[in-house]
């Protein structure tokens, strides 16, 4: 981003709380990294999973260097490229092309001195999207992709139930995320049944409003549902397929433990 804007420094203020403690995770089959950026190939997540689980660490070729730097054993690293297919238990994972043009210029070398043939190979080495085919439904993870006509290709090649699509509001002079209309269009091209917007709340500099995506989808009579989730909530497919919001389950579940006969108030109608 510094490279694309010419800024001397960037202020990546995190604007969403950490709602999961990685050290509390004791069971994990695979850690899938979409690309080399530190918020998607994260030391503070990798280390706990390395120590407390037997999971595989999966990612594009250039993430292998990062995994090894974090002391992940070679036999737990799975390097993949577009077109590769592998299984983790009953989930078939397809590595497909990424369209993350920001990661494409995350490079120490002088980009002007890289031959176009070599430059064209960088994306596949540094970033991937994933299609997870499960017995119950299929999930598409767009990583940090920008909008691309290739979403249409992926929609023709795979049946997508849920599309996880990054978007945000870009500052003037900077394009790091898809905008709300891009996110709508990506999900439509993928033929998704549900669009779950993501990454819009991670960084203050590109913080977006997911109801903008919902508004566009409603205006365009989108053939999919936009589901907006609160941080730390859980989406269950297909039970939640028609839900437009996922709230904290405690709001419902906690009432089951209330006992009206034990209420202790000054008089019954106090509250």
Pin down the residues of each PLM region.
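Binuclear metal-ion centers of metallo-dependent hydrolases, dominated by the metallo-beta-lactamase
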Residues: 56, 71-87, 180-271
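Beta-strand-turn-beta hairpins that frame and shape the catalytic cleft
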Residues: 85-94, 133-139
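Active-site-proximal loop/helix segments of hydrolase catalytic cores
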Residues: 44, 114-190
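Active-site environment of divalent metal-dependent phosphoester hydrolases
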Residues: 37-41, 64-67, 84-87, 101-104, ...
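Structured loop/turn residues at beta-strand edges in well-structured enzyme cores
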Residues: 26, 72-75, 89-91, 125, ...
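Active-site neighborhood of phospho(di)ester-bond hydrolases with catalytic His/Asp-centered motifs
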Residues: 27-39, 58-60, 139-145, 163-168, ...
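Local beta-strand N-terminus motif with an aromatic residue
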Residues: 28, 54, 159-160, 192
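Pre-active-site segment of Zn-dependent metallo-hydrolases
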Residues: 1-36, 44-48, 102-114, 120, ...
């Amino acid at each position: 981003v510094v490279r694309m804007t010419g800024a001397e420094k960037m202020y990546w203020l995190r604007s969403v709380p950490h709602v999961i403690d990685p050290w509390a995770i004791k069971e994990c089959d695979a850690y899938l990294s979409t690309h080399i950026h530190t918020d998607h190939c994260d030391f503070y997540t990798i280390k706990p999973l390395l120590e407390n689980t037997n999971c595989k660490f999966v990612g594009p070729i250039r993430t292998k260097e990062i995994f090894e730097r974090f002391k992940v054993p070679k036999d737990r690293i799975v390097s993949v490229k577009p077109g590769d297919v592998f299984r983790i238990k009953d989930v078939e994972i397809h590595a497909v092309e990424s369209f993350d043009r920001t990661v494409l210029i995350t490079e120490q070398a002088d980009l002007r001195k890289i031959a176009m043939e070599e430059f064209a190979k960088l994306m596949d080495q540094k970033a991937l999207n994933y299609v997870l085919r499960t017995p119950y439904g299929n999930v598409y993870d767009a990583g940090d992709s920008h909008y691309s006509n290739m979403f249409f290709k992926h929609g023709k090649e795979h049946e997508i139930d849920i599309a996880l699509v990054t978007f945000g509001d870009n500052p003037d002079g900077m394009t790091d995320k898809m905008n709300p209309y891009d996110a709508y269009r990506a999900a439509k091209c993928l033929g998704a049944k549900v669009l779950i917007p993501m990454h819009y709340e991670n960084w203050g500099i590109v913080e977006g409003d997911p109801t903008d995506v919902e508004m566009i989808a409603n205006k365009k009579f989108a053939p999919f549902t936009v589901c907006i989730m609160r941080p730390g909530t859980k989406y269950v497919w297909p039970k939640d397929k028609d839900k437009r919001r996922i709230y904290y389950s405690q709001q419902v579940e906690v009432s089951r433990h209330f006992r009206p006969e034990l209420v202790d108030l000054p008089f019954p109608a106090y509250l």
